[in-house]
Amino acid sequence: MTKTSKLDALRAATSREDLAKILDVKLVFLTNVLYRIGSDNQYTQFTIPKKGKGVRTISAPTDRLKDIQRRICDLLSDCRDEIFAIRKISNNYSFGFERGKSIILNAYKHRGKQIILNIDLKDFFESFNFGRVRGYFLSNQDFLLNPVVATTLAKAACYNGTLPQGSPCSPIISNLICNIMDMRLAKLAKKYGCTYSRYADDITISTNKNTFPLEMATVQPEGVVLGKVLVKEIENSGFEINDSKTRLTYKTSRQEVTGLTVNRIVNIDRCYYKKTRALAHALYRTGEYKVPDENGVLVSGGLDKLEGMFGFIDQVDKFNNIKKKLNKQPDRYVLTNATLHGFKLKLNAREKAYSKFIYYKFFHGNTCPTIITEGKTDRIYLKAALHSLETSYPELFREKTDSKKKEINLNIFKSNEKTKYFLDLSGGTADLKKFVERYKNNYASYYGSVPKQPVIMVLDNDTGPSDLLNFLRNKVKSCPDDVTEMRKMKYIHVFYNLYIVLTPLSPSGEQTSMEDLFPKDILDIKIDGKKFNKNNDGDSKTEYGKHIFSMRVVRDKKRKIDFKAFCCIFDAIKDIKEHYKLMLNS
């Protein structure tokens, strides 16, 4: 089904079966999840502290329900794009959880303004009850859905009768329903020389006038009083204003839009960056950092939370760099200094702090063994092999937090443009040699803290790592002084928590690569009449290379492949885990 036909298909649907086809799920799955088990029985609730006082309740759906909700989100997003195209509407007002929109773009719309009005909608998602959601799909002129279809969509979207925070489809449904309000408020703002935008429950209206239009808001002794017309439009749209969060700010003071300062450029509040850096410093020194929970009690924070904070700061910096035409992609990821630590010269202070955290997450504070490979195809091989051999290596798996299913308990490092920029690590033995050369300096930068898990480089036993092995022979006292001996070892302990595993030499002593661990009948598989050549990275008229082999043979046919030759790698990983555990306890 093409993208442009989805709205018509949804309008034409008259049954759950029709809806299931549009969502590309089986009817029995849709019915079982929504009705037999019951959508209300498939949520886990937890709270997170709000920026100010109080807590925010998150309702996280199960994987099965989340899958349906994501499909509904994609469907409704496509329908909305089609509606806007038909009606020639440009969505310049709603920025929350929208395709191509962000919290930064929302703030950017109000940068450098004289006066900014911030309005908060009270209990935003709770304002969308089951009847309101169902009624929208039934009566809105853009949809006019069949009652069965409208009811099923509302059933999938709502929890305890309202849209929950935590569902993938809550944002798109709320934005659809808010569309009329957005257009009316934008028109009202424009009438009085103001700019309007909304990010979920945060409404922002700004102006370059020296005084804010009286029709929009005034400052009274008791505080900011919103104009009657403005209040009427919001309340008629089914929302209540949280008066305690209404505020007017002027250019002479700090102006914020959805948590970002906008006086001159869009920026992170300095206190936020200092807090993030301080939390990271505590993590490096003690192995943990503390944040207050919903009751104000200090509890240990996770790596993901801190990474989110650093990532948000970097996202804002990158946005400003692009706007200033500095470090514009792809130039941002091009290194100009080839010395060992030269890549850091391109990083500003914030980026250096983020770089240090990323390194810590993967190689010093890693909560499970980190596996580094030479390239992306090796990652695919190892994952497919380990899943196939799961019963033989239960210690290399863990239960998922939200289900009884198992997942690999190894962090198989994925290199990309981001890791190249922040870590100078994008795969290939040249990068890995520099990684080892820098390891001691990086290790020392975490104030003597000791990693709890090993870092394991899994490499081909061919000419690729020759320079690295020669470096170990000449510069690392703990390693053998004979490269030939190293090539025969089950694993090499370099120093600290760093190890190397090489593919085993052939029975005749010849060098090998990871592809040599596959059975001959798998290596002989032809794709489109072409033979596999492990030394061919491209795709010629007669041969195909590693990428196609990894995707169309290993990934697509993994259930039919005998991966027993990979046991040598996983046995080595098991032994390394035990070796490092003994080191920590000695």
Curated annotation (Swiss-Prot):
GO terms for biological process: defense response to virus. It holds the Pfam family RVT_1. Mg(2+) binds at residues 120, 201-202. GO terms for molecular function: metal ion binding; RNA binding; RNA-directed DNA polymerase activity; RNA-DNA hybrid ribonuclease activity. CDD domains: RT_Bac_retron_II. Disruption phenotype: No synthesis of msDNA. Its EC number is 2.7.7.49, 3.1.26.4. Keywords: Antiviral defense, Endonuclease, Hydrolase, Magnesium, Metal-binding, Multifunctional enzyme, Nuclease, Nucleotidyltransferase, RNA-binding, RNA-directed DNA polymerase, Transferase, Transposable element. Signal peptide: none annotated. InterPro entries: Bacterial_RT, DNA/RNA_pol_sf, GrpII_Intron_Splice-Mob/Def, Reverse_transcriptase_msDNA, RT_dom. The keyword Transferase applies. Residues 29-262 form the Reverse transcriptase domain. It comes from the Bacteria. It catalyses: DNA(n) + a 2'-deoxyribonucleoside 5'-triphosphate = DNA(n+1) + diphosphate; Endonucleolytic cleavage to 5'-phosphomonoester. The N-terminus is the reverse transcriptase, the C-terminus (downstream of residue 430) is also required for msDNA synthesis. The C-terminus was originally suggested to have RNase H activity, but may have another nuclease activity instead. Belongs to the bacterial reverse transcriptase family. Reverse transcriptase (RT) component of antiviral defense system retron Ec67, minimally composed of a non-coding RNA (ncRNA) and this RT. Expression of these 2 elements confers protection against bacteriophage T5. At multiplicity of infection (MOI) of 0.02 cultures grow normally when infected with T5 without collapsing, at MOI 2 cultures enter growth stasis. Responsible for synthesis of msDNA-Ec67 (a branched molecule with RNA linked by a 2',5'-phosphodiester bond to ssDNA). PANTHER family: NUCLEAR INTRON MATURASE 1, MITOCHONDRIAL-RELATED, RNA-DIRECTED DNA POLYMERASE. Retrons may be the ancestors of retrovirus. This is Retron Ec67 protein.
